Amino acid sequence: MLNIRPSTRKQAKIKLALQGCAGSGKTYSALLLAYGMTSDWSKIAVIDSENGSADLYAHLGTYNVVSLGGDYSPENYIEAITLCENAGMEVIIVDSISQCWDYLLDFHAGLQGNSFANWAKVTPRQNAFVQKILQSPAHIICTMRTKQDYVLNEKNGKLVPEKVGLKAMQRDGMDYEFTVVLDIDLKHHVQASKDRTGLFMGRPEFTITPKVGQAILNWCNLNPQQTIVQPQTSQTYGNSTPAPSC
C-alpha cells in the first residue's frame, strides 16, 4: 500500500568515485579521504586490483588490504566488499572498478551467438556489483581509470604534449550511481564533475588532503541541529603536499 510522508534526512554513507588517468594519484588520494573520514587507519580497507599498489603507501598507516588475486569478476568484488563489511570496516576503497568492467567486456567477447542478446548474460552481473556498492553500510570510495590522450600546452613559448584523462573505463553512465565524482589530473588537481553534497561544485580546483574527507563526513552526519561545514575553497585543503603518482 502506498503512503505519503514528510521528507527526512538520515545519516548517509558516501558513495564516491575518484577518476583519473594512470599516475594521477587516485590510490593515495583515496587513502587521504578515507583517513579524514575515520581518523583510524584500522577502519580502512583497500580492495586491491592493481597488483599490490595498495601496499605502496603503508608508511601512511596500518590500513587493511584485500587482494583480488587476479580474479576481477563482479562476484569476487562483491565477496571482497562483504568481507570488509563483516570485518567492521568504516571506509572501503575499491581500487579500481575499471578492472571489473574489463573482465566483463572480455567475458562478453568470448560468448557465442548474438552479441546484443549476450548482454543479458553480462548486465545482471554488473548490476549486482553496483547494487552491492550502493547498499553497503560502509562508506565506499571507488577509483576508475580514464582513457588517455595527449594535448599540446604552451610552456615557456614551446608546445609540450601533456597526458590527459578522458572517459572513465567503466559502463556508460556509471558516474550517475555515485553521490560525488571527483576528477583528478596528473598535477593532482581535483574538480567535481558530479556533486550532490554541495561541497565542491562551482568551486576552484583543489588538492585532496584528509580535511576533504572530514568535510564529507560532516555532510554525511548532518541532522536538523547541524549545519554543513563547507570545505576550504583555496587550491589545497590543509597540507599542500601533492599526492604521489599511483
Model regions: which residues?
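Conserved inter-motif catalytic segment of the P-loop NTP-binding fold
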Residues: 21, 40-131
